[in-house]
Amino acid sequence: MTELLSPAGGREALVAAVQNGADAVYMGFGSFNARRSARNFSDEEFLAAVRYCHLRGVKVYLTLNTLVTDRELPALAETARRASEYGVDAILVQDWGVYETLRAVIPDVPLHASTQMALHTLSGVEEAARLGMTRAVLARELSGGELREIAERAPIEIETFAHGALCMCYSGMCEMSAVIGGRSGNRGACAQPCRLRYGWHGKADANPLSLKDANLAAYAGEMAEMGVACLKLEGRMKRPEYVAAVTGIYAALLREHRAPTADEQKKLALAFSRDGFTDGYYRGRRGKEMFGVRPETARWPEEWFGTLRAAYEKEDMRLVPVRFRAALRLGEPMVLTAEDGDGHCVTVTGAAPEAARSRAVTAGEVEARLRKTGGTAFTVSDCAVTAENGLSVPASALNALRRDALAALETLRTEIPERREGTFVPAERIKNPTEPPRFTASIYRAGQLTDALVNEGVETVYVPLELLPSVEVEKYRGRTKFAAVLPRVWRTADEEGLREQLRTAKERGVECAVLGNLGHFALVRGLDMELRGDFGLNVFNSAALRFLKEQGLSGATLSFELRHEQLRDISKCIPCEAIVYGRLPLMITENCIVANEFGCRHFKGRCDAACADSACAAAPELTDRVGERFPVLHAYGCRSELQNGKTLWLADKPEYRKIGLTYARLRFTTESAEECVRVLRAYKGREEYTPKDITRGLFYRGVE
């Protein structure tokens, strides 16, 4: 049966989830999770929570799905070790350094690929399986058909979000909160700037980045039928009563194999919505109708929530059925066998019955006494008593027999498995290169690559794979290297075409492929190209670099969320690169921001055109409340990539030359060909030039 996974942002929410039918809960422990402001659990609370859940047949998943620095890794390893010791069933991860660490420290604990890994293709899931992960949480942006295609062919379990908040950006790829305010969504501190007002033509008069919550209740049965192993409910930041309401409805739908009633849909909306719900991604219908905000007048339904709260606080609705078999014989210890539905079975003995001097106990009276399980997590579903005639048994002896049996059964159900433990070993310290970095350049338009740029000296030119047919690779061979940048987001159906494009690129002299997602490793396998990691791999620590080296990468771009000291201190087992110039990418979105506002004649659910004659060719600018303008660029598959309004500029800052980088990347997006050359000349100290509206990015301030 498909598992229902509910959020547990605190003890009360955990009880609400379990009592209303959750098969599993996900929760935080310590500070390393994607909802740091949720009420996470202390050691004592976490152990008690695991026991509470396991007693009732509910699994517990720990969220360690954030990016972690080298200094934080030892504490994370210890957190994971204690969670394993307390019996956690699986751990969700995003950071490849965390993955490496957990495989070494707690090798027997199952790992799940978090949605923060941005897995959205069969190839990505297959790569997660190759690495030993047992489950992949897919991106929310997939359609029902795409979900089915993956679920039916996946070698590991598939989990998908069924209800709750939708981020505008693909999870794990959003930098908006980090770049604008220093609060990283990749470290559990997202400030949700996407919920604010933005607009066009200099006005912030709408909410074009605020999606309604997803509601896939109508498709719960369909997803179960297609082989989805787990339906996940979002909401670790929401009230426990919300968790109770949504869990209860989805549990009933899965248990009873039916569609939601109109009343249930009304209750889901009453619990929480942003001006209604959306199923747009699941149905493959992107567009403006998917967007909404929570009205300022919205209030929690306190009366209904009070009823829900009273139910899960005062009554254990999640009792474990047990079968009793009792045998009473004169002069022999009483025997009681208790068995649950999960294969646990115990047998206990009690005081020996004596011959009755007056009234003898009956089998029915023994059964009635054994069925009194109040105050426990058990209920007797069946009780068979075999008793000789003429016996006397004190009620206290029967009570003790029942208590002993249930205590023994509880011990079995909450038993913590024996697991191996390893030792955390920090990455080997490798001395930083002392030479200044060589410059690479990524381009967005073919016209940005010119003789003048190449003549100034660019070690490698990064070109989007889909742009390569328009680039004169042959003209510049021998004067610079070319690297094909794979799309940040694609679909399983695109993969053969992408492989063919890579083969063609290699034949033309493109030597290198740039990977930004786990699924890319499958796309390039067997092509014998040099492989470099892009910023999308979110390299935040030395262990992540070590992992990427083991996967065959010859270089990697470090996360631009890192401060220069953190960039310096990473142990560079392979050549490292950092973005030192350009508009930093804030979001990549499945919904085309431009098409939603201006329309697009190519926009028919998906688009193979380059959008050269559409609105997004001009890089329209989204405006925020303070007048900052954010260019929106076209991305592969008719998606949008939102850029920062200010340009990262470090040409006048010598620190980036002294932190062990092999390459320094100039990221060109909206620049003219002439501007590209001037930027490169400025970074090489050959021209006095500074663009307008610059920022130092996160190079000095870093992120929370």
What are these regions (language model features)?
Residues 34-40:
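Short glycine-enriched, charge-decorated loop/helix-capping segments at active-site entrances
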Residues 41-46:
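Glycine-rich, highly charged phosphate/nucleotide-binding loops
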Residues 117-121:
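Conserved phosphate-binding/catalytic loop of the ribokinase/pfkB sugar-kinase fold
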Residues 1-20, 24-34, 47-50, 56-84, ...:
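Surface-exposed amphipathic alpha-helical tracts and adjacent flexible/coil segments at the periphery
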